[in-house]
Amino acid sequence: PRDPDMFHVSTLVNEAARLAGRDKDYYPDSGVNNIMSFGRIAEYIMRVPVWEECDKTNSTFDMQVILKDTKENIVGTLDGIIRAKDEPFPRAIVEIKSKYSKVGSPLDNWRYMAQVMAYLKLAHTTVCWMPILYFPRGEPDVQARLFKIRFDVSEIDANWNLLLNARDALIDESINERE
């Protein structure tokens, strides 16, 4: 369950998108029914390549991790983190996605990258493993890919500042509504 006293990363990404005029790209096609069920199934399926990659790299996959920045009052619910078996600190975060399109680069999806960089900030790391299950509308069949994406700290910090501005806009909006 979400902490009602904290701002969730996804809320801040949605607000940043709205402020930037990107809110129209959020909603799925009307032809996709019960999209959350497909997403949950894809998330379960796409854990397998993460586990396989962890076996190859002597790493562990901690699933369903909640990270908080209590100073900034922000919480993130990650699909997981990757750690070396003998280290307590994350090497990478895991963010599992499903897309109803042909295979493409996740770097082209602004929302994905904004969410991932926020999670990286919370986890104090710079690498994301992003398994994506693609459901194309035509040929070919379903495709699964595991992307490993590294960001510069400066990119992560710039994204974090964008989300802090979105948080502040939500706070200002709430104050104005009460007046």
Language-model segments: residues:
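Short coil/turn motifs at secondary-structure junctions
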Residues: 85, 99-101, 135-137
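Metal-dependent nuclease catalytic cores that hydrolyze phosphodiester bonds in DNA/RNA
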Residues: 1-92, 110
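Short beta-strand-loop-alpha-helix junction that forms the active-site gateway
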Residues: 95-108
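Metal-dependent nuclease catalytic regions and adjoining charged, substrate-binding loops involved
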Residues: 106-109, 122-179
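A structural signal for short, well-ordered beta-strand segments and their strand-loop junctions
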Residues: 60, 93-95, 127-132
